[in-house]
Amino acid sequence: MSYQHIENLYKNQTILLFKECFVLEKIHGSSAHVAWNDGRLRFFAGGVSQLAFEALFEHARLKELFSALGHPKVTVYGEAYGGSQQGMKATYGDKLKFIAFEVLIGEAWLNVVNCVDVTQKLGLEFVAWEKVSTDLAVLDAWRDKPSVQAQRSGCGEKPAEGIVLRPLLEFRDHRGDRIIAKHKRKEFAERASGKDTEVDPARHELLVKAEAIAAEWV
C-alpha cells in the first residue's frame, strides 16, 4: 500500500485547531516503505532502484527484529533519499539512505512517540521531530529551520524541505481522513507562485470561530 497524499497547510488547516502538535522534518526524496506480513519481509523502493534499496538493510537481522515486535502486520513508511535522489546530494550526502517517518500496525496508525519506539526497536533511523505550539509564527519558524538530516549526514547547514504536522494523538476529521498536513519552504513550493507555502490568517480565523461556535453546542 502506497503512502497517502498529504495536503499543504494553506489548504487544510484542521491541525491548527489543536493547541500543540508534532512537527517532523520533511525529507526531499522518494517515498518508500518496508513491510512485515505474517513472517515475510517486503521492500517497496518507490522511485529508486529496487536492488539498491534492498541493499540498505540487513535482511536476516531485520526479520528477527520485526518478529520480536509480536505483530503479524507492520509497515514502516519513510523516504529513500540522498545520492542521486531529487538532486539533493549536497544536502543529504552522496549515498542512498532510508529514514522512517510513519508506522502502521495492522490498520492502526501510531502516534509519533510510538513510531519512534518501534523504529528504534527495528534499528531504523527516524526523522527529527519536536512537540510545538500550533501558533503560525512558531510553525513558520520551525519550517524555516536548517535541515537536521543534513547535519546528521555531515553536510553542514542546509535548508530543510519543510515540516509535516501531526496531532499528539491520531485523529480523523468528519470525512474520516487522518489529520495531518505539510508546510513547505518557498524553495520547495509545489506551485510556481509559492502560495502553497503561505497560510491565510483570515481563513484560519474563520476556522477558529467555527470551532468556538460548535463548542458552544456540545
State each model region's role:
Residues 1-218:
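Core nucleotide-handling region used for phosphoryl-transfer chemistry
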